[in-house]
């Protein structure tokens, strides 16, 4: 537990606490008790609080909680479940500061003698609502069964890249992207099929197929992977890519707060460090 002094936009300074100090840059709002000793609740809509480090304006919400009478709570909706639910109720912003981190194993174990190249990539989770199946690809020449995934070109959004990759890898063209996860995954591995180490930021988008409209796949793509429709209940056994398994386990029905370990991001001097290492300090 870490304590801060928070300045409100009316000049009043109040004490506040943060359950996990390493999440300070993920704070997007502040909660004050209904029976607080600082402000008139009728004025809350006209007030903001100042982030103790960045100086950003934070929304203030009032909760019927006696524990908040003398000390406010800093809210981190992306990483604390109770705060995530408050964010849904009060329309608070989410800011990810811990990225789930995946490191290559087996043939994709990092090669210390090879340079690492950064890449933005996308995981596209596409559903056929008629039979509750999901569009996947199976690579016959290597052990790789996954959702559709691929790199994001410099000028593309994750949504645009997903639609392009779906067309190239499966031939399907009548697809709608319906949502993008608030989370980015980090994947550090040796891309044995490319001969380079990669550090990828993985964006996750979800969508649906509208029809069976397809275009002919190139012969090169046919050799690399085959499209398959997999039932929801069979995805756990089908998927072999660990970060895809994470998506299937946690994000299929909507985002939830990520409470686990990972690489710090959007956190200035803490960026690139493991959360678990910071918690031990």
Task: Annotate each predicted stretch with a short phrase.
Residues 1-98:
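NTP-handling and nucleic-acid-processing catalytic cores
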């Amino acid at each position: 537990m870490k304590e801060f002094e928070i300045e409100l936009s009316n000049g009043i300074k109040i004490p506040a606490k943060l359950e996990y100090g390493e999440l300070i840059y993920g704070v997007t709002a502040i909660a004050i008790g209904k029976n607080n000793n600082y402000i008139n609740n009728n004025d809350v809509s006209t007030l903001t609080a100042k982030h103790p480090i960045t100086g950003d304006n934070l929304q203030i919400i009032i909760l019927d909680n006696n524990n908040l009478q003398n000390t406010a709570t800093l809210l981190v909706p992306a990483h604390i479940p109770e705060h995530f639910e408050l964010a849904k109720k009060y329309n608070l912003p989410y800011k990810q500061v811990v990225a789930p981190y995946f490191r290559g194993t087996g043939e994709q174990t990092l090669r210390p003698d090879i340079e690492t190249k950064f890449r933005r990539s996308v995981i596209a989770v596409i559903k056929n609502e008629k039979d509750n199946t999901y569009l996947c690809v199976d690579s016959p020449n290597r052990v790789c069964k996954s959702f559709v995934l691929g790199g994001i070109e410099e000028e593309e959004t994750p949504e645009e890249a997903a639609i392009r990759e779906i067309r190239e890898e499966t031939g399907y063209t009548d697809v709608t992207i319906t949502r993008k996860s608030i989370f980015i995954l980090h994947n550090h591995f040796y891309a044995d099929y490319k001969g380079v180490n990669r550090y990828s930021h993985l964006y996750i988008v979800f969508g649906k197929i509208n029809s069976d409209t397809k275009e002919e796949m190139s012969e090169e793509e046919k050799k690399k992977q085959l499209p398959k429709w997999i039932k929801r209940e069979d995805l756990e056994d089908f998927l072999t890519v660990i970060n895809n398994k994470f998506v299937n386990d946690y994000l299929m029905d909507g985002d939830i707060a990520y409470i686990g370990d990972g690489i710090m991001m959007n956190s200035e001097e803490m960026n690139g460090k493991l959360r678990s290492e910071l918690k031990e300090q």
